[in-house]
């Protein structure tokens, strides 16, 4: 296979990996956790994965503690947990 063909194949595989939704089997278990604001009193806008709606929603994080279902962006949440 030529180098151009290999490059095309690599590009297609990368695109497929980005567009393939994450199944429940592949989703990290922390995506199933309810959002936790933590024990501090900050008011940071964060995103969590909502298992029931399969969406990445906003919550407010206190700044410390909490759990791993806590993302800075919706894109990060979607890439990790597969939400909409």
UniProtKB/Swiss-Prot annotation:
Write out the entry's keywords from A to Z.
Disulfide bond, Protease inhibitor, Secreted, Serine protease inhibitor, Signal
Q: Matching PANTHER family, A to Z?
A: BPTI_KUNITZ INHIBITOR DOMAIN-CONTAINING PROTEIN (PTHR10083:SF374), KUNITZ-TYPE PROTEASE INHIBITOR-RELATED (PTHR10083)
Q: Which InterPro entries match?
A: Kunitz_BPTI, Kunitz_BPTI_sf, Prtase_inh_Kunz-CS, TFPI/VKTCI-like
Q: Where in the cell is it found?
A: Secreted
Which superkingdom? Eukaryota
Tissue specificity here reads:
Expressed by the venom gland.
Signal peptide coordinates: 1-24
Where are the residues marked Reactive bond for trypsin as a site? 41-42
This chain's function reads: Serine protease inhibitor that inhibits trypsin.
Q: What does the sequence similarity comment in the record state about its family?
A: Belongs to the venom Kunitz-type family.
One GO cellular component assignment for this chain's record is: extracellular space
Sorted alphabetically, which Pfam families does this protein's record hold? Kunitz_BPTI (PF00014)
What is the disulfide pattern of this chain? 31-81, 40-64, 56-77
Q: Name one GO molecular function term.
A: serine-type endopeptidase inhibitor activity
Q: Where is the BPTI/Kunitz inhibitor domain?
A: 31-81
Q: What is this protein called?
A: Kunitz-type serine protease inhibitor B2
Kindly give the PROSITE patterns that the UniProt entry links to this protein. BPTI_KUNITZ_1 (PS00280), BPTI_KUNITZ_2 (PS50279)
């Amino acid at each position: 296979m030529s180098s151009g063909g290999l490059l095309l194949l690599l590009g297609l595989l990368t695109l497929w990996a980005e567009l393939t939704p994450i199944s429940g089997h592949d989703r990290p278990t922390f995506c199933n956790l309810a959002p936790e604001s933590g024990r501090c009193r900050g008011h940071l806008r964060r995103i969590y994965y909502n298992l029931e709606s399969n969406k990445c929603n906003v919550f407010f994080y206190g700044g410390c503690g909490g759990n791993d279902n806590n993302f800075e962006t919706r894109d990060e949440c979607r890439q990790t947990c597969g939400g909409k």
